[in-house]
A protein has these predicted regions:
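Residue-level preference for long, well-ordered alpha-helices that form the structural scaffold
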Residues: 45, 49, 302, 306, ...
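Short secondary-structure transition/capping segments
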Residues: 74-88, 108-116, 160-173, 373-380, ...
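Trp/Phe/Arg-rich N-terminal binding region typifying the photolyase-homology
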Residues: 1-153, 252, 315, 361, ...
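A broad detector of short, well-ordered amphipathic alpha-helices
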Residues: 20, 311, 434-438
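Glycine/tryptophan-enriched, flexible segments
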Residues: 132-280, 284, 392-393, 397-454
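Active-site-proximal binding-pocket segments
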Residues: 215-405
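Charge-dense, low-complexity intrinsically disordered segments
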Residues: 43-47, 180-187, 300, 389
C-alpha cells in the first residue's frame, strides 16, 4: 500500500525516522506543501528553503523518487493526494512549535496522520523532573538529558532506493536566488559538519565567542530546516569527544554538545509553555514600561546606532541573513537594556530576517538577554557593548568588514570613536543614547513591584 511522506522541517534522507517508518509500510510519495503561513518570511529565507527543496528533489531522484509540491490548505492538499494515489496513511516527523501542533491536530481530525519522533534526541515529554513537571533550569535538564541518552546514537544512513509511483501531479518547484555564503541542502549541511569536525570543533570553547574568527559551525540554518538532524549533530559531537587528543579539545567538543542540548532545552520549554511565544516567561517582568522609540528602533535595524559593534552585527544580519551568536546577545542587550525597547520587537525582526529563524531558539535567546525568560541572565546584567567589542573583536576586524565607514580607524579607537573625539564620514557622530544603567534597572524593578502588588 502506497503512503504519503509529508516532509516539513526534515529536508534530509539521512537519519530520517519518518521516512524509515513510511518505507517499512510500502512505497512512499514525498510531498512538501507550500504553507501560506511561510509567506511572511524574508525573501532570503524563502530562497534558502526553495533552494533546499530543489536539492532535496535531486537527492530523491538519485534514488528513483521525486518531490511532489502542493500548495494551499493543508488538509485539502493532503486529502486530494491521498485520493489521487489511493493511499491510506500520512507519515511525518513530529514538530513541537505551537503552530505545528495546532496544524497537525487539524490534519489528524480529518485524515490518518502518523507522527514520528525524530526532530530531537529526546521527546519533550520524556525528560521530566521526578514530580512529572518539565525542567525550567538548564543545568539539571542537561544532566537528565545526558543520563537518558543511549550509549549508541548512530544515525541511520540514507536509503539507497525509494519506491514512488510515477506521474503524480505536482506544482513546479519554486524559483530561488542562490546565497553564496549559505548554499542550501542536505549535502551542503553534511559538508559543513565534516569541515567543522576537522577544524573548529577542537578549539570551539576558545573561539566560539570571537566575532572576528570563523569559530562556529554555522549549521543553525540547516538544523532549523532539518537538512541536518539534531541527532546527527549530537552523534558527531560525542564522536569528537572520543577522538579528541587532550583535555582542551575534548572540552571544546563537549561545549558544542552543550550548545546542542540548549537547543533541545528551548524546544521543550516552548512545547510545555507555549505562552512564551507571546509574553515573558517570568510573569514579574511582563509589565515593563518600555520607551519603544520607533526612530531608535529603525536606527537599530539599519545598523545606524553609532555603536560600531552593534551596527556591524545588524548590517551582517541585513546582508546575509545570519549573525554570530555573541553578536546576537550584544544587539539584543543594546535594544532592550540601553534603548528600553520591547524585546518582542527585536525578536520579530530577527524572525523576519534570519535564515535560521527558529521560534524556540530565537524566543528563548531574546528572553534570556532581556532577563524575562526561563534560566535567563539576571535582569540587572547589562552588557557594555564597547567592552564586549574589545573582548570579542579585539582588532576591530569584524567591525571593519561590516561598517566600511570605520575601516581606516585604528584598532584602539574603532570600538568607541566618539570617546576619542573622532568622526567618520557618513557614520553617526555619537551613539543614540548615553548609557544609563539606573534607568534600565528602575524600569525592571517597577515591573516587579507592580506584580507584587497584584
Amino acid at each position: 500500500m502506497t503512503n504519503i511522506w509529508w516532509v516539513r522541517r526534515d529536508l534530509r534522507l539521512t537519519d530520517n525516522a519518518a521516512l524509515q517508518v513510511a518505507l517499512e509500510a510500502g512505497p512512499v510519495v514525498p510531498v512538501f506543501i507550500l504553507d501560506p503561513a511561510f509567506s511572511g518570511s524574508s525573501l532570503r529565507r524563502k530562497d534558502f528553503l526553495y533552494e533546499g527543496l530543489h536539492a532535496f528533489d535531486r537527492d530523491l531522484r538519485a534514488r528513483g523518487s521525486y518531490l511532489v509540491i502542493r500548495k494551499g490548505n493543508t488538509v485539502q492538499a493532503l486529502g486530494e493526494l491521498l485520493w489521487e494515489t489511493d493511499s491510506e496513511t500520512i507519515y511525518s516527523e513530529e514538530d513541537f512549535t505551537p503552530y505545528a501542533i495546532k496544524r497537525d491536530e487539524e490534519v489528524a481530525r480529518h485524515l490518518s496522520l502518523n507522527l514520528i519522533h525524530g526532530q530531537t534526541a529526546h521527546h519533550p515529554n520524556s525528560i521530566l523532573k521526578a514530580n512529572g513537571t518539565p525542567y525550567i533550569v538548564y543545568t539539571p535538564y542537561s544532566k537528565a538529558w545526558k543520563a537518558n541518552l543511549p550509549s549508541r546514537l548512530t544515525p541511520a544512513p540514507a536509503p539507497e532506493k525509494i519506491d514512488t509511483p510515477v506521474r503524480i501531479r505536482s506544482e513546479p518547484l519554486p524559483r530561488y536566488k542562490v546565497s553564496p555564503l549559505f548554499p542550501s541542502g542536505e549535502q551542503e549541511a553534511l559538508t559543513r559538519l565534516d569541515e567543522f569536525l576537522h577544524r573548529q570543533i577542537f578549539s570551539y570553547s576558545e573561539d566560539r565567542n570571537r566575532m572576528d574568527l570563523e569559530g562556529t559551525s554555522t549549521l543553525s540554518p540547516y538544523l532549523h530546516f532539518g537538512m541536518l538532524g539534531l541527532r546527527q549533530a549530537i552523534h558527531a559531537a560525542r564522536q569528537a569527544m572520543i577522538q579528541a587528543r587532550g583535555e582542551m579539545p575534548k572540552r571544546s567538543a563537549e561545549v558544542w554538545l552543550n550548545e546542542l542540548i540548549w537547543r533541545e532545552f528551548y524546544i521543550q520549554i516552548l512545547f510545555h509553555f507555549p505562552h512564551v511565544s507571546q509574553t515573558a516567561f517570568n510573569a514579574s517582568l511582563a509589565n515593563i514600561e518600555w520607551i519603544n522609540d520607533e526612530s531608535q528602533f529603525e536606527a537599530w535595524k539599519a545598523g545606524r546606532t553609532g555603536v560600531p559593534i552593534v551596527d556591524a552585527a545588524m548590517r551582517q544580519l541585513r546582508e546575509i541573513g545570519w549573525m554570530h551568536n555573541r553578536a546576537r546577545m550584544i544587539v539584543a542587550s543594546y535594544l532592550v537594556k540601553d534603548l528600553l525597547i520591547d524585546w518582542r520587537w527585536g525578536e520579530a525582526w530577527f524572525m523576519e530576517n534570519l535564515l535560521d529563524g527558529d521560534l524556540a531558539a530565537n524566543n528563548s535567546g531574546w528572553q534570556w538577554t532581556a532577563g524575562t525568560g526561563t534560566d535567563a541572565a539576571p535582569y540587572f546584567r547589562i552588557f557594555n557593548p564597547v567592552l564586549q567589542s574589545i573582548k570579542f573583536d579585539p582588532n576591530g576586524n569584524y567591525i571593519r568588514r561590516w561598517v566600511p565607514e570605520l575601516r581606516q580607524l585604528d584598532s584602539k579607537v574603532i570600538h568607541a570613536p566618539w570617546e576619542h573625539g573622532l568622526k567618520a564620514k557618513g557614520y553617526p557622530d555619537r551613539p543614540l543614547v548615553e548609557r544609563d544603567k539606573e534607568r534600565t534597572l528602575l524600569a525592571y524593578q517597577q515591573s516587579k513591584q507592580r506584580m507584587e502588588r497584584v
